[in-house]
Amino acid sequence: MTEFIGSRISLISKSDIRYVGILQDINSQDSTLALKHVRWCGTEGRKQDPSQEIPPSDNVFDYIVFRGSDVKDLRIEEPATTPSAPPVQPPNDPAIIGSNSGQYNWNQAQTAQPPQPVQPNPYGAPYQQAPPAGAPYYMYPNAPAQFVPPGGLPLGTPLDASTPAVPYYGAPDQQQMGQRPEFAQNVSQGFAGQAPYNVRPGYGMPSNQKPPNFAPGMPAPGPTAVSASPSLQSMPPTNGVIPGAQPSIEASIEKESTSIRNSTVTNDRVVNTTVDVSQSQTVETSGPSKEVPTTQPDASAAKPRTEFDFQTANQKFQSMKDDLLKGKNDEEAEEFYKPKQSFFDNISCESKEKGMEAADRRALRDRERSLNMETFGVAGSGNRGRRGRGRGRGGRGRGRGYARNQYNQYRNSNGSQPRAQPANDQ
């Protein structure tokens, strides 16, 4: 399906709406196809119900992706245009200097009209008119010098084998002609007996390139079989220089020469400064050399003569570890439980109270009474009196019995069962 990419596609969906666009992409994994520059044509009477018909639209969508399962019909209206073949390149031959992909027509080049004479340009450099249609390659501006025919020859004229290869140079301006008056004389002497070339300005090499200086003793080339065209010989030569622009050109050349002289002086100063710096560096380096501190290995570090014995070192380490563990086991473990300072060893009991002295028991009861008062708000159970012994001590026994009744009332208030009160002996 990739060969249909770029074709104009007419697509009808299951909604009976037709779309026309250019096939952009086909995704077989997602079962989708994409169209670009899509136009919506509507249902076009496929609904068979005027109320459900969808009219077309003039809007063009840039990109639409369609699901393949929802496509009802697909038709190719215009196939994809085949791309133009790439231009044929010449072989990689060092003998080829330049090439042109177009076919050269010699007959058309011979009948081509010569370029119009150069019009004076008020801004200095002469400008050129566009060459006629079908003109050869060298008639265009900025053409390489090797494609330019010798001056005075008609365009497209074949050269004889005896014609020497004479490079073509543009007409120099007046100032260059004034500076080199021997140029015209040498050329006329060197090419005596040959038809003079009518040099046309504006073609060939730029004006800032200096022509070669022919020596007077240079042998003249042989005669050529090609003569200059009469129409070109009758054409008056033009130098392309405006008379009124001569002072401005001389002033600009004077400024350029001044700037060149200034730059030359500056370059001389820079060269002298560079020489002075190099001489000063030479003088400094010729003096006594300073020692540069370098990092050298310590000679006192002795290198081991034998390899390290890992087995012996591991045994030694294991013995040291065993000694340390044995010393820790020999030490007395820290005592965390101290009976004299522990809370549970100070709990009062009857056997402990009996073993105490009377003063110790009294102090213990006072402390317990104060703790009870602070904790419960009641001092304690009071004195545990005993019954009086004998009749003579009956009053004391009854008094003790009254204290016993108070103790029972205290226990009843705290939720305990009252004890049976023994009868007082009368």
UniProtKB/Swiss-Prot annotation:
<keyword id="KW-0131">Cell cycle</keyword>
<dbReference type="InterPro" id="IPR025609">
    <property type="entry name" value="Lsm14-like_N"/>
</dbReference>
<dbReference type="GO" id="GO:0033962">
    <property type="term" value="P:P-body assembly"/>
</dbReference>
<dbReference type="GO" id="GO:0003729">
    <property type="term" value="F:mRNA binding"/>
</dbReference>
<dbReference type="InterPro" id="IPR047575">
    <property type="entry name" value="Sm"/>
</dbReference>
<feature type="short sequence motif" description="FFD box">
    <location>
        <begin position="335"/>
        <end position="351"/>
    </location>
</feature>
<feature type="compositionally biased region" description="Pro residues">
    <location>
        <begin position="84"/>
        <end position="93"/>
    </location>
</feature>
<dbReference type="GO" id="GO:0030371">
    <property type="term" value="F:translation repressor activity"/>
</dbReference>
<feature type="short sequence motif" description="TFG box">
    <location>
        <begin position="360"/>
        <end position="380"/>
    </location>
</feature>
<feature type="compositionally biased region" description="Polar residues">
    <location>
        <begin position="226"/>
        <end position="237"/>
    </location>
</feature>
<protein>
    <recommendedName>
        <fullName>Protein sum2</fullName>
    </recommendedName>
</protein>
<dbReference type="InterPro" id="IPR025768">
    <property type="entry name" value="TFG_box"/>
</dbReference>
<feature type="compositionally biased region" description="Polar residues">
    <location>
        <begin position="405"/>
        <end position="426"/>
    </location>
</feature>
<dbReference type="InterPro" id="IPR025761">
    <property type="entry name" value="FFD_box"/>
</dbReference>
<dbReference type="GO" id="GO:0170008">
    <property type="term" value="F:mRNA phosphatase activator activity"/>
</dbReference>
<feature type="domain" description="Sm">
    <location>
        <begin position="1"/>
        <end position="80"/>
    </location>
</feature>
<feature type="region of interest" description="Disordered">
    <location>
        <begin position="204"/>
        <end position="305"/>
    </location>
</feature>
<dbReference type="InterPro" id="IPR010920">
    <property type="entry name" value="LSM_dom_sf"/>
</dbReference>
<comment type="function">
    <text>Required for G2/M phase checkpoint control.</text>
</comment>
<dbReference type="InterPro" id="IPR025762">
    <property type="entry name" value="DFDF"/>
</dbReference>
<feature type="compositionally biased region" description="Low complexity">
    <location>
        <begin position="261"/>
        <end position="278"/>
    </location>
</feature>
<feature type="compositionally biased region" description="Basic residues">
    <location>
        <begin position="384"/>
        <end position="401"/>
    </location>
</feature>
<feature type="compositionally biased region" description="Polar residues">
    <location>
        <begin position="279"/>
        <end position="298"/>
    </location>
</feature>
<feature type="domain" description="DFDF">
    <location>
        <begin position="296"/>
        <end position="332"/>
    </location>
</feature>
<dbReference type="GO" id="GO:0000932">
    <property type="term" value="C:P-body"/>
</dbReference>
<dbReference type="GO" id="GO:0005737">
    <property type="term" value="C:cytoplasm"/>
</dbReference>
<dbReference type="GO" id="GO:1904689">
    <property type="term" value="P:negative regulation of cytoplasmic translational initiation"/>
</dbReference>
<dbReference type="GO" id="GO:0034063">
    <property type="term" value="P:stress granule assembly"/>
</dbReference>
<feature type="compositionally biased region" description="Basic and acidic residues">
    <location>
        <begin position="350"/>
        <end position="371"/>
    </location>
</feature>
<feature type="region of interest" description="Disordered">
    <location>
        <begin position="79"/>
        <end position="100"/>
    </location>
</feature>
<dbReference type="Pfam" id="PF12701">
    <property type="entry name" value="LSM14"/>
</dbReference>
<feature type="region of interest" description="Disordered">
    <location>
        <begin position="348"/>
        <end position="426"/>
    </location>
</feature>
<dbReference type="InterPro" id="IPR019050">
    <property type="entry name" value="FDF_dom"/>
</dbReference>
